[in-house]
Amino acid sequence: MSNPIKIGIGGPVGAGKTQLIEKVVKRLAKEMSIGVITNDIYTKEDEKILVNTGVLPEDRIIGVETGGCPHTAIREDASMNFAAIDELLERNDDIELIFIESGGDNLAATFSPELVDFSIYIIDVAQGEKIPRKGGQGMIKSDFFIINKTDLAPYVGASLDQMAKDTEVFRGNRPFAFTNLKTDEGLEKVIEWIEHDVLLKGLT
């Protein structure tokens, strides 16, 4: 059984977590063996969405119904996600990379370091220019931070420049990107981070 790298994807409901996984997997699945675990409170809606996109065979995607508070299942009691990892590896023992999508949660949600090796936190512009200024733990502690749906900025009166400045205050030099996942704008920066910082491509 392999020991795959695990990347957690966190963020509020509707920020673009599932779409991010779809886009990234579509790019990376040609080069490596990938699995996905989704967390939803009472349904397996995100699992169904990913299955319907066809980015991976159905046996490489597992939906976890967390119940209650979704952040508990990725931090305080991650047993359901550990079980899902074991099941994925029993189905496909060649898996090299697993994405674990959290249920939509608040800005304070973070992944247990025992569950994932790296984490990405994603918000969207429509949630307000002030979100990066709030400095939630998900944004501050994640290895990579994404501000999605940049095309909506003019409609909600958000300044991307101000959001970038506020992000840099809390994250320092830690990487982040603006994206519009609908058009793939900014996706390349996310892919590059995964390839170079997570998969260590190009290092000898």
Swiss-Prot record:
Pfam families: cobW. It is found in: Cytoplasm. GO terms for molecular function: GTP binding; GTPase activity; nickel cation binding. Keywords: Chaperone, Cytoplasm, GTP-binding, Nickel insertion, Nucleotide-binding. The keyword Nucleotide-binding applies. GO terms for biological process: urea catabolic process. Its main location: cytoplasm. It comes from the Bacteria. InterPro entries: CobW/HypB/UreG_nucleotide-bd (IPR003495), P-loop_NTPase (IPR027417), UreG (IPR004400). GTP binds at G11, P12, V13, G14, A15, G16, K17, T18. One of its GO terms (cellular component) is cytoplasm. Gene3D superfamilies: P-loop containing nucleotide triphosphate hydrolases. The keyword Transcription does not apply. Facilitates the functional incorporation of the urease nickel metallocenter. This process requires GTP hydrolysis, probably effectuated by UreG. Homodimer. UreD, UreF and UreG form a complex that acts as a GTP-hydrolysis-dependent molecular chaperone, activating the urease apoprotein by helping to assemble the nickel containing metallocenter of UreC. The UreE protein probably delivers the nickel. Belongs to the SIMIBI class G3E GTPase family. UreG subfamily. This is Urease accessory protein UreG. It comes from Staphylococcus epidermidis (strain ATCC 12228 / FDA PCI 1200). The lineage of its organism: Bacteria, Bacillati, Bacillota, Bacilli, Bacillales.
